[in-house]
């Protein structure tokens, strides 16, 4: 469940489009009828406070973010199959069948596009969620160590 002020900061469509037009976002994308974006202010505030941002972006968001002044390190967590994606969605029991079908089609597109050269620095195969999580944590710890050893 997404929570205001924790997972996202919700604004109405007009406000986000004004912010996008004003250049206040590093990236933005529309996904399943919702507009998502990463504000420059949020990322800059994190940097000033010596924090590292970990973001959950779709493929278009990653492409946009790669073209910013930042040096993002991108990790794609690849499902082993579309059946795995469908099973996870069904287990959540939050979407209707047509929505699940739409999300599986989007996952197929993402899986195909994730192979684009230079888009992802690392790809983790999610054959076991706990192992994939451990790999992600190790990558984050390595990147944090590298960052603080060079700055």
UniProtKB/Swiss-Prot annotation:
Any GO MF annotation of the entry: guanylate kinase activity
Guanylate kinase-like domain boundaries: 1-141
Keywords: Kinase, Transferase
Gene3D superfamilies: P-loop containing nucleotide triphosphate hydrolases
Protein name from the UniProt record: Guanylate kinase homolog
Taxonomic path: Viruses, Varidnaviria, Bamfordvirae, Nucleocytoviricota, Pokkesviricetes
Organism of provenance: Vaccinia virus (strain Copenhagen) (VACV)
Family, similarity comment: Belongs to the guanylate kinase family.
InterPro entries: GK/Ca_channel_bsu, Guanylate_kin-like_dom, P-loop_NTPase
Pfam families for this protein: Guanylate_kin
